[in-house]
């Protein structure tokens, strides 16, 4: 499947830059000979593009070399020239006269303004006018006016306001139209009613670049319809360890399979008038232990060979932007790496567009903060994504240029790149976004887009087990469809779905979408059969049990082991209970990665890896069910794009990905094929070393939920983002502590009424084991404003049962604005009246007066970590 043979591709990507001119000429001759041997166009146009892109690793070393000696063949020299001209991306064309003239006319302030990107929650239209900002973005779960249910008209109204401000020159602004970026990673996933396609891991299993190109174009049209011109996609990460929380954003663990998707996505988006972004440069899928934003430990040649293929192809296709990655490379944050961002990406790979930083990514560079990082600009960041602290960043860049810390030439290069992109997509001459979008208003969730999504769903599912050819099922009988994921469009869509984490949604948030249950029920009804959802409703002919991961995004999804439900095994118990009906059970597993589900595979009669299919549940029904005549409707085309693990951990070294493969890349059974998989090992290698209960770590962890309580509503579910108590006394909002949205800001008003934020769950929890082991409740707090200094920690164990502890002492232990990790021994709560065997809320904060805090990292642990401040039981 390689467009380049492995030995040739290695030469192209990894040719040492210090190679002598003679070695470079030898490479040219070798390329020419190989091309002649394979024919003029052995694998289509992709070959010449890759050759041209790859040559940059060697061609850059030719500058200043003498002309080839006379014994160099004319044929070889001609071949080099042809290969260099095969794609324009290999030779920077430079700015157009228009861009050059525009740059010349800009003041320093206007240039720096073009380099700044703030988040819409922190940027008003007048800010765009006053500072001449070049860009805004909406992060995951960020909406116009803060309205989750914002209409297309409201999206366009905000886009129009930013546009009008950007061309308003009354405050000294240069009048350059702004560009708005968004994370539309599986459809326009922030917009209610948009088509939601399968996440990349499913598209990798479908393995059809042409289909993926159609999805990219459809997504771009829906994005354009809301007045947005820039998509932060495609993700061309090559996920090597499924423990990584962003595995589902990767098409495959195979660099070649990832490579083949890059060009169709870039082309599909940019031909639809929207800027594409290849991300995250580079190595985000190869971090140690799969830790998000962690360290990728590879030499340069291996880094490019394993993680650079998608960028080579995206650049060859003309991607206009590249996003830098959070992760480090051998200990150093890539946001500060000139070697990778400039020497490799821009100079050797020939990237002509602009590089944008990731969300506050510059702040992770050693010696930098979120609002101050000359090193990142000098390394090659052209546009800085600074969601909240953009104004301070703007002022700091100005000061650093004036002080000589950032060369003016670096500013000019960055702004030139940004202006070239704006010119390329016609932004410099655009009309108001609402006018541009008028012909596209009807495309949001359009039937033709949903048809593409449905096709992608049915072609992505992988049949892992199929005893006696059970699947597809006959729809003319009675089917029991059940399980926690059966009727949940949010769960089947995964992270980056309306909210950043994909949590806090109901089926009502997906107008036009269809759950797996609804998709099955519609087809069964049409065939004359019936669907029931519990054994109490009748006796089924077969059972479909849908289960899987709760949605997550980024580091929140990082896991220590691939074991599914290592603690509870509730799904296994449910499958076994359903088998007691005497009817066959088809298990449909919703996940963002291959996982160790040996026990569940052993138990079920058939097992389907459904990945995260998105809004079109009918696509799942298409392959699970036969038609009304008992015939196969569609084949099972999905084949694994990542290996499926035999064990939960690497037995020899848990730091490494699981090496023992149960099902290899390319595996998948056909519809009706008899594939029996039994006797798989069910003993876990990884053993839980602690019984710690995590309530909040980046997000609220299931089964816990966060509630706001006051005199009007004692149990208002807060969801994953901003919320207010019913009477308005307490507001909750998401903020950043260490990574994006990993903390919550709690602001009490001066109401005189006790208002509480607390964690609860549907069933009582037995914490007596942790209490008996000397455990503690731990939490991190930062005091922002302390008007009343009236704060209590509250816990509950049912009606008229609980304990309250005064927390006024925290105002004495930390300075205003300082994060402190606290621990309260569980024995304190037990003494105060908390029944440890029936805890319904182990943590809450209550106040009656004006107080603003930030909260993070809430857990009940056996042993608090180092640096924790232990609170005294009886202290006020």
What are these regions (language model features)?
Residues 7-15, 20-51:
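Bacterial N-terminal signal peptides that target proteins for export
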Residues 61-64:
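C-terminal motif of bacterial Sec signal peptides marking the signal peptidase cleavage site
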Residues 66-714:
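Glycoside hydrolase catalytic-domain context in secreted enzymes
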Residues 480-481, 624, 777-781, 841-845:
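Buried hydrophobic-core signal for structured, non-transmembrane domains
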Residues 685-737, 869-876:
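Extracellular carbohydrate-recognition regions
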Residues 725-759:
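Short carbohydrate-recognition loop motifs
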Residues 752-833, 847-866:
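Extracellular ligand-binding interfaces
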Residues 831-841:
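Noncatalytic modules at the cell exterior or secretory-pathway interfaces
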């Amino acid at each position: 499947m390689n467009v380049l043979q492995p030995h040739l591709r290695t030469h192209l990507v990894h040719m040492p830059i210090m190679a002598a001119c003679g070695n470079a000429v030898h490479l040219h001759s070798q390329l020419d000979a190989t091309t002649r041997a394979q024919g003029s166009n052995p694998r289509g146009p992709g070959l010449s593009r890759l050759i041209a892109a790859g040559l940059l690793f060697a061609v850059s070393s030719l500058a200043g070399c003498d002309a080839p000696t006379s014994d160099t063949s004319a044929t070889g020299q001609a071949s080099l020239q042809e290969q260099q001209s095969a794609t324009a991306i290999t030779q920077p064309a430079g700015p157009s006269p228009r861009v050059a003239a525009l740059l010349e006319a800009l003041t320093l302030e206007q240039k720096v303004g073009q380099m700044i990107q703030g988040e819409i929650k922190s940027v008003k239209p007048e800010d765009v006018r006053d500072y001449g900002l070049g860009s805004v973005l909406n992060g995951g779960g960020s909406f116009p006016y803060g309205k989750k249910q914002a209409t297309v008209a409201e999206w366009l109204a905000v886009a129009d306001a930013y546009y009008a401000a950007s061309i308003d020159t009354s405050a000294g602004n240069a009048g350059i139209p702004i560009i708005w970026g968004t994370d539309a990673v599986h459809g326009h996933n922030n917009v209610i009613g948009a088509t939601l396609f399968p996440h990349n891991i499913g598209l990798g299993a479908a393995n059809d670049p042409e289909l993926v190109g159609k999805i990219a174009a459809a997504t771009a049209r829906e994005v354009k319809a809301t007045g947005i011109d820039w998509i932060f996609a495609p993700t061309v990460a090559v996920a090597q360890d499924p423990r990584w929380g962003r595995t589902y954003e990767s098409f495959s663990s195979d660099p070649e399979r990832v490579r083949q998707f890059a060009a169709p996505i870039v082309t599909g988006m940019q031909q639809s008038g929207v800027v594409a972004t290849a991300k995250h440069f580079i190595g985000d899928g190869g971090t140690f232990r799969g830790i998000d934003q962690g360290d990728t430990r590879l030499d340069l040649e291996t880094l490019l060979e394993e993680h650079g293929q998608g960028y080579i192809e995206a650049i060859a296709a003309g991607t206009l932007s590249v996003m830098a990655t959070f992760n480090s490379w051998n200990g150093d944050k890539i946001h500060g790496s000139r070697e990778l961002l400039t020497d490799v990406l821009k100079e050797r790979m020939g990237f002509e567009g602009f590089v944008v930083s990731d969300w506050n990514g510059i702040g992770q560079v050693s010696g930098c903060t979120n609002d101050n990082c000359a090193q990142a600009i000098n390394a090659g960041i052209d546009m800085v994504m600074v969601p909240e602290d953009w104004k301070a960043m703007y002022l700091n860049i100005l000061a650093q240029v004036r002080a000589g810390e950032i060369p003016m030439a670096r500013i000019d290069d960055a702004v030139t790149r940004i202006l070239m992109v704006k010119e390329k997509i016609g932004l410099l001459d655009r009309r108001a976004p609402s006018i541009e979008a008028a012909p596209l208003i009807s495309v949001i969730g359009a039937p033709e887009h949903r048809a593409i999504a449905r096709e992608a769903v049915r072609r992505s599912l992988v049949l892992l087990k199929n005893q006696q050819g059970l699947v597809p099922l006959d729809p003319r009988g009675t089917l029991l469809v059940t399980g926690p994921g059966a009727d949940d469009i949010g769960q089947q869509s995964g992270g980056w779905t309306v909210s950043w984490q994909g949590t806090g949604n109901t089926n009502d948030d997906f107008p036009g979408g269809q759950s797996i249950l609804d998709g099955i029920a519609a087809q069964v009804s049409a065939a004359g059969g019936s669907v029931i959802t519990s054994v109490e409703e009748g006796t089924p002919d077969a059972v479909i049990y849908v289960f899987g991961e709760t949605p997550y995004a980024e580091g929140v999804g990082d896991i220590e082991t691939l074991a599914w439900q290592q603690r509870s095994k509730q799904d296994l118990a449910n499958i076994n209970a359903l088998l007691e009906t005497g009817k066959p059970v088809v298990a449909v597993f919703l996940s963002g990665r291959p996982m160790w589900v040996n026990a569940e595979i052993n138990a079920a009669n058939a097992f389907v890896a459904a990945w995260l299919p998105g809004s079109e549940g009918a696509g799942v029904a298409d392959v699970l069910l036969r038609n009304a005549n008992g015939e196969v409707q569609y084949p099972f085309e999905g084949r694994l794009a990542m290996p499926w693990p035999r064990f939960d951990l690497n037995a020899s070294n848990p730091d490494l990905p699981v090496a023992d493969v149960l099902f290899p890349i390319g595996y998948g059974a056909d519809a009706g094929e008899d594939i029996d998989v039994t006797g798989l090992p069910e003993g876990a290698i990884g053993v839980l070393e602690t019984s710690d209960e995590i309530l909040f770590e980046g997000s609220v962890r299931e089964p816990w939920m966060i509630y706001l309580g006051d005199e009007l509503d004692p149990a208002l579910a807060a969801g994953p983002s901003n919320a207010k108590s019913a009477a308005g006394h307490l507001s909750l909002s998401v903020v950043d502590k260490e990574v994006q949205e990993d903390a919550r800001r709690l602001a009490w008003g001066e109401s005189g009424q006790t208002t509480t934020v607390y964690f609860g769950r549907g069933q009582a929890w037995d914490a007596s084991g942790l209490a008996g082991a000397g455990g503690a409740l731990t939490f991190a707090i930062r005091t922002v404003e302390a008007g009343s200094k009236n704060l209590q920690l509250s816990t509950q164990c049912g009606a008229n049962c609980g304990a309250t502890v005064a927390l006024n002492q925290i105002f004495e232990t930390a300075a205003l604005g300082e994060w402190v990790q606290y621990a309260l021994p569980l024995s304190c709560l037990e003494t105060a009246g908390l029944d440890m065997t029936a805890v319904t809320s182990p943590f809450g904060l209550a106040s009656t007066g004006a107080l603003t805090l930030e909260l993070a990292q809430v857990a009940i642990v056996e042993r608090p970590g180092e640096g924790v401040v232990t609170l005294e039981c009886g202290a006020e």
